[in-house]
Amino acid sequence: MQEHFQNIPEELKQYPHWLVWKLEDKGGKKPTKIPYSIHGGMGKVNDPATWGTFDEAVARCRSGNYNGIGFVFTNSPFVGIDIDGCIDPTGGIAAEAADIIEQAGSYTELSQSGKGFHIILRGTLPEGKRRHGSFEMYGDGSARYFAITGNRWGTQTEIIENQTAID
């Protein structure tokens, strides 16, 4: 996938919650996005010592052997909505996905696979409310990261606060 890091919102870039990742085969299953530290070695979503700045992650990614950069949600004000498999082979978008994107009204990008979307908002992830049908939500306390592409979808370039959409 072509690099679009310049489209990533500045607000997200300001947090030193970045790592790099690469696709690795795990025993015959579909390849998994394995996190790596920008300092070398494995990246851990629960260990800030393995994270770095946006610029460090981009430099590490460009140095080779990595497929992309990722943002860790731990200890941040952001919530990520991950909608998988909602784009059909003709480019059509599932109605539920289109509704979620519209309701969120925040920065949205194509996922690494090109078959789904990531939406990033400011807000708080409700307790126990992480998976809903075809989408999942991650935030502080979820020990997860997003592979960030910068391949923006739509015209919204900023991350907005939208607790109503998160709830």
Positions of the model-derived regions?
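Conserved phosphate/metal-binding and DNA-contacting active-site motifs used
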Residues: 1-167
